[in-house]
Amino acid sequence: MQQLQNVIESAFERRADITPANVDTVTREAVNQVIGLLDSGALRVAEKIDGQWVTHQWLKKAVLLSFRINDNKVMDGAETRYYDKVPMKFADYDEARFQKEGFRVVPPATVRQGAFIARNTVLMPSYVNIGAYVDEGTMVDTWATVGSCAQIGKNVHLSGGVGIGGVLEPLQANPTIIEDNCFIGARSEVVEGVIVEEGSVISMGVYLGQSTRIYDRETGEIHYGRVPAGSVVVSGNLPSKDGSYSLYCAVIVKKVDAKTRGKVGINELLRTID
């Protein structure tokens, strides 16, 4: 694996000079191998190690290199034709392979090659970009978008129209991460490498970026870039120091544990916020 990483790192340093016409065989094979490993879930752009999320920047570099080494080409779809550098993940799937891998794909859901989809996942008409990782038992609902290299945990529900941001550039940015057993409400946006920790519930229409203040009304603490585990979050506003205006924030209205989540439905958690 170190040899593969070395090839990617070296090629990335000279990426401006690489084209589909002049790319060498070693680089092309290395990039294609990485994309295949991401596609199968054998590698992932970020993983939790000793309780901390670690981003493997060289894998993101491989994804970016894939755009340098491939020409656009025509791709046939059910409703129309496409012209792009990245093939569709399911282009060569037959019924036997779909059954073996054990997930459902509802037309016209789109998944790019290099994204991993785990067993018991349901993809409604949605979009999953290259480098993303969608773990077991997750629902990606209608018109939801999972951005490049985003990491989605087990038993997550991404409701209709949810946007999970991609972060291929800038390269130093960490991917957006939704941990296990989270619920993201309709039309919410989680971007810029924000981490929504395990068991959190995000209400409809909540927008979370690195500069969004995430206010815990019980403690008065303000978080940036991270929703603590077990948080129930709604949209809100915080006043300016002089009280002359207010600005958008997200508000943690309560904390719940796994036992409470098991007994109480998501809708009930969001309705009883007082």
From Swiss-Prot:
Localization per record: Cytoplasm
Chain positions recorded as substrate binding sites: 104, 141
GO cellular component: cytoplasm
Primary location group: cytoplasm
Catalytic reaction equation(s): (S)-2,3,4,5-tetrahydrodipicolinate + succinyl-CoA + H2O = (S)-2-succinylamino-6-oxoheptanedioate + CoA
Description of how activity is regulated: Inhibited by p-(chloromercuri)benzenesulfonic acid and cobalt.
InterPro entries (alphabetical): DapD_Trfase_Hexpep_rpt_fam, Hexapep, Hexapep_transf_CS, THP_succinylTrfase_dom1, THP_succinylTrfase_N_sf, Trimer_LpxA-like_sf
Gene Ontology molecular function, alphabetical: 2,3,4,5-tetrahydropyridine-2,6-dicarboxylate N-succinyltransferase activity; nucleotidyltransferase activity
CDD domains xrefs: LbH_THP_succinylT
Keywords tagged on the record: Acyltransferase, Amino-acid biosynthesis, Cytoplasm, Diaminopimelate biosynthesis, Lysine biosynthesis, Repeat, Transferase
Keyword Lipid biosynthesis (UniProt): no
The protein's annotated pathway: Amino-acid biosynthesis; L-lysine biosynthesis via DAP pathway; LL-2,6-diaminopimelate from (S)-tetrahydrodipicolinate (succinylase route): step 1/3
EC number: 2.3.1.117
Example GO biological process: lysine biosynthetic process via diaminopimelate
Root EC class: transferase
Quaternary context: Homotrimer.
Protein family according to the UniProt entry: Belongs to the transferase hexapeptide repeat family.
NCBIfam families recorded: dapD (TIGR00965), PRK11830.1 (NF008808)
Name of this protein: 2,3,4,5-tetrahydropyridine-2,6-dicarboxylate N-succinyltransferase
Native source species: Unknown prokaryotic organism
Upper classification of the organism: Bacteria, environmental samples
